[in-house]
Amino acid sequence: MAFASSIQFCSLQWLLILLCLGNTFSQSIVKTLPGFSGLLPFKLETGYVNVERSEFFYYFVESQGNPLTDPLILLQIGGPGCTGLTGLFNQIGPLAFDSSTYQAALPSLKLVPNSWTQIASIIFIDAPIGTGFSYSTCAEDYIVSSDTNTASMLGKFIRKWLEGHLRFKANPFFVGGDSYGGLLAPIITREIVEGNKAGLEPFINLEGYYVGSPHTDTNLEENSKIPYAYGMGLISSRLFERAKRSCKGEYLNVEPTNLKCLEDLAKISECTGNLNIHHILRPNCSLSLPMPNKDKQARRSIEETNSRYNRHRYLNFWCKGTVTEWTRCNDSVTYGSYIYDVESAIGYHKYLTDTRIKVLIYTGDHDMRVTHISTEEWIKSLNLTIDDDWRAWYINGQIAGYTETYKKSKYSLTYATVKGAGHSPTEYKKAECYGMFERWINNYPL
């Protein structure tokens, strides 16, 4: 199951840049980047942290506010297998591609006005192993790479990272997760909680975690898509009611003898199958490309290239001690060796809501990959007390989405929808998401 973003990097040109960034020692300060004029107006550090036999590569952007007191965030991106650069350039980092220069030999970079690094220091991690520049010197480590193994490794990663960055030891610490990283974030957070309890050093000043468009429970997410499609006007009320009766609310694991249900699901698929499920209002690029006059030839070329590429990546997956080929989302991780050993992360959220930390969960209301319906359903299962009932929240006098807050003791869980956003919200509504984060991190209501 791939939770990679539909937005792709300009691979050829940026591979060259990434190789430049990748030629680092354990830590390197990057002061300039191709495509950006002059010195970077923020501190960017790249490097490796060794965890057992694995080398985790990271991009660290120091807060542009007060780095010695501002929050420190470890961000896990989705896929699994998508590089932390996705978060840095596409979501909450201080730089983005200038789309007006995409036809140039080298695309330009521009500063982002709503970067979360204005008020927080962020570690963008390449994880699990095999993602981005992260690698292992032992082939066995790729075989055992899994949800729980990755979370355990990243719990060790952050303590070792802090050992080399002791000036951030006292900063309030948060784990962030996006898309499939939303499943990993609470598992990583629990690793940190348990490590603190066990007296591991350095102690991590954990204050909370947040997840955006979080993959949490496959059954809930898949079964929510049909009610979501009806609610968004994508299927008729007649078809929806008929499918509810024939499938009895279970749309994922349908018995092959239930022909009425299968027929209804086929009709629903006809209505929704060609949508861009990451944002239902956006074009489905796989249908619009390549250009019509080169359609057959281009499609055949793409299919052949992808076939060769996937075989090449799989056969050379055990290359040890280096990263010979960089890709934004490594299919050899997503569809190959990675073990999906956590079917539902709800239990981790239940555990964490009993601890002394705060939580932010947000979704895009036009996301059909992980619908807001499924997220609201598992939040309800946590049996928390509503502290601030469902209401609109605003940015610049306009409704930015809807929110409600749950409370347990003095610590709270804030849930928010982001109006008009897809999967993931920070890619579509940067100003709104920045405002949401700024209020939450400073303990203000949305």
Which sequence ranges carry the predicted segments?
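Terminal and linker regions of secretory-pathway proteins
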Residues: 2-446
